[in-house]
């Protein structure tokens, strides 16, 4: 088994153990679901954070980017683990976080961390779970409005509910570590 395959196997086990729930849930998209992956639980777990950072860095290693970002709160631990491990790997990526609403005081900005970037810098956007792609697109627009170029979008989980297609229509190819089918099958074993 390759190193990447072993890392994915370990992360899948943690996601199923820590983040998978069955029940009646309303998703950020407004849709109802009989299962839910709260990836924040895994992303805030020491091993989970390390695995996510390693795997995202592996996905991004061939891209000419200056940093990674995502919508707060779900992307906060993803950005942190990815940036910290990028430095350890000798390819430092800076982080940025997109607010759902501007601060309303101070600089009144939607995007935090811009001081580490120059206008036109290329970045990748990170997301925990993609359902319709709406939250990720909102974050992408705010980052573009701030003057940065988005060259990749990555997620831990693609729920396979149209998000990949929506993102593609907007010019973004989704790089997901897992699909819903992969993780739900594993969870129900």
Where are the regions that the model predicts?
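Short glycine-rich phosphate-binding loop at a beta-alpha junction
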Residues: 63-74, 151-154
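Active-site-facing substrate-recognition patch
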Residues: 1-63
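Acidic, divalent-metal-coordinating active-site segment for phosphoryl/phosphodiester hydrolysis
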Residues: 127-140, 162-163
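PRPP-dependent phosphoribosyltransferase catalytic core
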Residues: 2-14, 141-189
């Amino acid at each position: 088994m390759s190193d990447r395959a072993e890392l994915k196997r370990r992360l899948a086990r943690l996601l199923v153990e820590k983040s998978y729930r069955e029940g009646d849930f309303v998703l950020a998209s407004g849709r109802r679901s009989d299962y839910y992956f709260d990836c924040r639980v895994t992303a805030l777990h020491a091993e989970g954070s390390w695995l996510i950072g390693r795997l995202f860095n592996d996905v991004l290693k061939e891209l000419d980017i200056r940093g990674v970002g995502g919508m707060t709160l779900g992307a906060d631990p993803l950005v942190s683990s990815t940036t910290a491990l990028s430095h350890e790997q000798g390819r430092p990526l800076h982080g940025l976080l997109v607010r759902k609403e501007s601060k309303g005081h101070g600089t009144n900005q939607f995007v935090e961390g811009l001081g580490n970037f120059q206008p036109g810098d290329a970045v990748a956007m990170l997301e925990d779970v993609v359902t319709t792609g709406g939250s990720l697109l909102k974050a992408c627009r705010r980052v573009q409005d701030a003057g940065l170029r988005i060259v990749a979008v990555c997620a831990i989980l693609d729920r396979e509910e149209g998000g990949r297609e929506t993102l593609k229509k907007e010019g973004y190819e989704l790089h997901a570590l897992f699909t819903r089918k992969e993780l739900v099958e594993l969870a129900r074993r």
